[in-house]
Amino acid sequence: MKPTLRLLTAFLFVQPLVLAQQAPQSVPNAVSVAGAATQPVSGGPINIGSRRELFIDRLLIERLDNASLKLHEPTSGGVVIRIDKPWEGPGNFGMSVIELGGRLLMYYRGWSLSDPKDQNGMACVAESRDGGVTWTKPALNLVAKPEWPDNNVIATEDGVPRFAFPCAPWVDTRPGVPATERVKMIESMPVSGEKHTAMRDPVGPKRLVFWASSDGVTFRKLAPQPEFVSDLRNSFDGGNTMFWSEAEQQYVLYYRFWDVSAKAPSADVDRLGGRGYRSMARTTSKDLMVWTKPVPMSYGNTPREQFYINNTQPYFRAPHLYLAPAARFMEGRRAITLEQGASAGLVNAIGSAKIDWTRDCSDAVLLTSRAGATAYDRTFMETFIRPGPGYGNWTSRSNYPLTGILSAGEQQIQFFVSRHYLQKSWHVERLLLRTDGFASVSVPWAGGEMVTKPVSFTGKSLEINYRTGAPGFVRVEIQNSSGNPIPGFALADCPEVIGDEITRIVAWKQGTDVSRLAGQPVRLRFVMKDADLFAMQFR
């Protein structure tokens, strides 16, 4: 591939924002970010307050005996949109899904690949009015083109379809944001003035430009214009996410860059020259105007991998927890032959660019982080969203999640994934998962237990999200910080909890009231059999 061709990397976008620089912000363990569970340097209890805690990492866990942390894969909710418009085509790509005004809006790039001069496509929108089950493409006609009747292309106020690379609209939830600026979007521009396209990533610093909308379809530039310039190599080439953090009380931006501090295998070579990893940096702002110095995210003591899109976002039921269903790109890892790719209808050229789109494969993994942290936790290295059967799922840059984890009712959550990239069979699939059910403390039939580190809490009762088999159970003992049962809350005082419930209040012989223990350092001992514990919360 020619050096100027960066292989469409930027079509996944997540909530981003822009910055001017201020001192770097790093939140060590000693700092208790509002809404975040942190371990004081003094070794005192972890203050979880009344927040819901999911078992997506080991922060709260002291000991696992015949128990393990288990990642749970989503199930398919069916295909929700396909290529069916003349302005769409094999270059379609999923961006983000938001909830606005009682409906869901899904943003995706429409790119027919029929015009050699068009190296970006354009941002389109679909909508669902039944909670994500069925989707339609509204006839917006914001862009006046006779060959695009009843088109669903989003645009500027003057009808220009300039958005597509990269832009992922997101809802700004900061209190006091004007209704006219509730939906925001960014685009990446080289400082040099060169055009940043899906097929060309100019060398040099890049900046983000902010747009806003009241309805999620017509956008105008913010004024005054926030701006963040990054000189990290290959900044913003897809995979940018941004949101207002309720836990941190500030805007947080995660954006992609090329990390040359760690040398990747020879197959993973930057098209701009040099070996490195597609990675993420984090920066924050109170007002969108002044931003902290970007800090590259770390990944703990785990093997480095290529992350095309990060999709980092607060979990709506526990906003201090940041979940990132990230697109993992296995560059140079071939699963199918050229002939098999051709049989799937794979496009082998974009304009004059001849590319072997069968040489790579992709899936999605679950990265997690917490408010204020500059590291991703990689408790789970295995695949979260699998490619699945069929040659079409084993081509380069397929299986990339869209930004957005949303409710699908009390029992389930939903998110979406882009399949069959650069094929006429491209589509977006709806995925479903148990509410809070990304991972669990899982115990087999033989039985086992999990004991937490010392924690302090506020509230009157302990709520759990759990499931058991017919012979299974969950029982809870509350201990003092030394590990001794507190009278009235010993294991023998807790009847077996049996069933499958998103919400269950734990009871002991004396009842459910735990308020006399609030504010004290305690340990929780969960003794289980044939059971999964997904989350807990004091309320």
Regions found by a protein language model. Give the residues of each.
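Carbohydrate-active catalytic/glycan-binding domains of CAZyme proteins
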Residues: 22-539
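Sec-dependent signal peptide recognition
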Residues: 2-10
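Hydrophobic h-region of N-terminal signal peptides that target proteins for export
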Residues: 11-19
